[in-house]
Every structure is written in C-alpha cells, then in structure tokens.
C-alpha cells in the first residue's frame, strides 16, 4: 500500500540557497524548526545521492524545491527499511479533462513560446495518463498559471531574481490548480543560461496533479533542480502519476484512404502559435538521426522509428537538443555522430553528447550565401557524401574540414526530376533519397539516378497516415 500524506498546498522551487527556502517554509507551515545537523542527517538517509552535493560546511549547493521531504515509512512486512519511492499529496483531480489559463507572461519570452512550453510541460504528464489539458482564454479554468511578483495574494511572496522560482498548490486544497512563477527570474527555454521554463513547469505540474517529491535522483519529481535534456519522466514518476490516474487510453484507429498524387502545388500551412498538425503543415527540415527520422516544424519535432510515429510526439525540439534555434532550415548527422543544424545565415553542431557549439556563420564553410535550405548525407556506406542545397544550386560539403569542396555551386538539374527550392532531403536504409518541398516529396532512385515514376506523393499520407482534406484533394484534380 502506498503512503498518502496530507501536506500543505505549497511546492516552492528555489534557485540558490535551499536552507533559506527550507527554513522559510517551516515558518509558513508552522512546523517546529529542526537543527541543521538533523536536517542533513535526515536527507542523507533518505536521499543518499545528494551527499556529494553538500559542501564542507554542510550547506546545500544545488537548487531544489523547498517542500520538506517526507519519506515513506519502513516496510514492516519485510522487516527492512524499504522505502516507497514516490509520495502522494493526499489529493487528486476527480476528472481527467482539465482546462488551463495563463494570466500573465514573463517579459523575456514571447507569448507564443510560453504557450508552447506550457503545453509541452503538461504533455509530459498527459502522454502517460488519461489526462487531457486544454487552454482557455476566457471564463473559468481548472488550472491558473501566472507569472507574478513579490506579494501576490497567497501569503507566499516571491523574492525577485534568484531564490524562489515557482510554487504550486496540490489538489483538494483551497487553491488547487494554482501555479505561480516568479516574473523576475531569467526564464529561458532549452538552455541553462537562465532558468529553464520547461523543466520548472513540468515539475510544478506534477505537484499540481498530486505528486510529492521522489527520492530517485533522476526523477522529474526529485526536489533538486537539475538542468537535464531531453526532459522525460522516470519510471518512478510514471508509477506515481499512474497510481493516481491510471494508464493512457488506447487510441481509436480510423481508416485513412490513400489519395493518388500526380501533381501537387506547393502549399504552406504554418501554425506558429500552436502545436503544428502533421496532417496540415509543411516542414522546415527532415533528417535521419541515429537511424530515426525526424521532421522539424516551428520548434517542434516528430520522431519516426521503423516508419512508426513514436508516442509523445510532436515534442519541442529543445527536449532533444538544448540551445537549438526555434526554427531549423536544414539538418544532418555526419559520419562521426555530430548533428548539424542550419538556420538563416548560421549553423550549430551538436556532438555525440548533445553538447552544442556555435552558432557559426555559414560563410565559414566557404560559400557566400545567407541560407541553406536542405542538407543530407547520401551514398553507399563506404562512399557517403554530404550535400547542401539552396534554390536551384547545391554544394558538396566535407564535415571534417568544415568546408565545401568547391565554392562554385552545381545545378540541381544534376538530380534528374528534383524540383528547385527543396525544403529538406534525407536517405533511407535502402539508399533511396527523398526530396521534400512543401507538403510533397519525391523519391530518388540511386540506381537510375533520377526521380522514380509516380511522384510526388503527400508526406502527410505516406509518413503520418493522414487523410487528405477535401479542399486539398480538389487541388490535385
């Protein structure tokens, strides 16, 4: 049986001096203060992984959530001190379809980016439960998200930059669903220069749904704030939230009749303010990375493995590559596992540990253009070459020297049947090349060295099993 503990409604995520946050909370919840040595002994016992994070004076260095850590009791049936890992707050939502509203936004980030990140943080929990989250802009909502300052009406003031980052209230309390972020923090997305909004929000939403802290060091619900990418739930997080709400409901499949495509006009249906729909949009870039196919659009990425879209996608690309630009023009993986991203007149390189270098100007590679529209690696295993495309021209590129083989471009007409102005290109396991433009793609035969008969096809149907809209079907006739 899992332990249910009735705790105060508050979770506070602190940025710097955890002892101050801890003492502050003790005062707020009117608990008897502990001596420092007792607090350290307690946490070393129940959170052994943090011993190395204490300095010589026994002070806490890592940022952490300020709620006192209440461990599960010993397992009396076994006679051993076997701990229950996740802990529940004592409450849960009585419904699974929840609405949320964002009242105010941080000054450093656009509303579009904040909305996108909040939706992504909620999706971390909805993809493993039956929960759904819908943003509303008017009227009442179940969840209130606010970026506010100092004293703001709940007797739990923020303290300006640093210190307290955010707090949330548990279900079945007088302020259930309230999640507050300190407006004055240096909020960022996808990097550790400031405070990463995605990771803080996902942690706070776990409390808002009813989870307390976990004693697992790599758990999202660990009290210690760690900048970690890609963001994902640990098994402990998943067990805890599914104990409250159950597993996700299986999707209901729907028939997807195929539409034959002979000729399709280039269409664009960018949805910048919301999560893009793969069935209705074009793509900024497509690339084969680590044997999987990634589609990029407006800061989001779809991940296909073995031709199947993976659960939890689309997701923010920054969950995989911290520091990636919001939009990607082209991407490819080189022979040693580095991943290259191009946007505008710059490029970034992520090494095998996903550490980024850059941005660098495109002129560094030996060409005087302001954008690369597509890039891919093509050829046999022993004779792979990297190609960069822009408009009606292309270059062969050497990632080892970071230079093009010749600053003089070649004509895309060398790739018989491939249109000018492609948006992306990639190669499959059989050696066939794919060229993407708008919502269509052309399959290129490596043996006949030309586009195969019957192309272009629709990306949405062949890769995402979408049914074409009647408007789009009529445009094909």
Curated annotation (Swiss-Prot):
- Keywords, in A-Z order: Calcium, Cleavage on pair of basic residues, Collagen degradation, Disulfide bond, Extracellular matrix, Hydrolase, Metal-binding, Metalloprotease, Protease, Repeat, Secreted, Signal, Zinc, Zymogen
Listed SMART domains: HX, ZnMc
Tissue-wise expression: Expressed in fibroblast cells that are activated by thyroid hormone. High levels in resorbing tail.
Gene Ontology molecular function: any one = metalloendopeptidase activity
Note the pro-peptide positions.
18-85
Name the positions where Zn(2+) 1 binds: 152, 154, 167, 180
Q: Which GO terms describe its biological process?
A: collagen catabolic process; extracellular matrix organization; proteolysis
Q: Where in the cell is it found?
A: Secreted, Extracellular space, Extracellular matrix
Region forming the signal peptide: 1-17
Q: Where does Zn(2+) 2 bind?
A: 65, 203, 207, 213
Cofactor(s) it depends on = Ca(2+); Zn(2+)
Tagged with keyword Lipoprotein: no
The UniProt record lists the EC number as: 3.4.24.-
Q: Which positions are annotated as binding Ca(2+)?
A: 159-160, 162, 164
Sorted alphabetically, which Pfam families does this protein's record hold?
Answer: Hemopexin, Peptidase_M10
User: What are the start and end residues of each Hemopexin repeat?
Assistant: 280-324, 325-369, 370-418, 419-466
Q: How is the cofactor bound?
A: Binds 1 Ca(2+) ion per subunit. Binds 2 Zn(2+) ions per subunit.
Classify the main location.
secreted
Could you tell me what this protein does? May be involved in the modification of the extracellular matrix during metamorphic apoptosis.
PANTHER family tied to this protein: MATRIX METALLOPROTEINASE, STROMELYSIN-3
| Record-stated family | Belongs to the peptidase M10A family.
Please state what the protein is called.
Answer: Stromelysin-3
Specify the species.
Xenopus laevis
Record gene name: mmp11
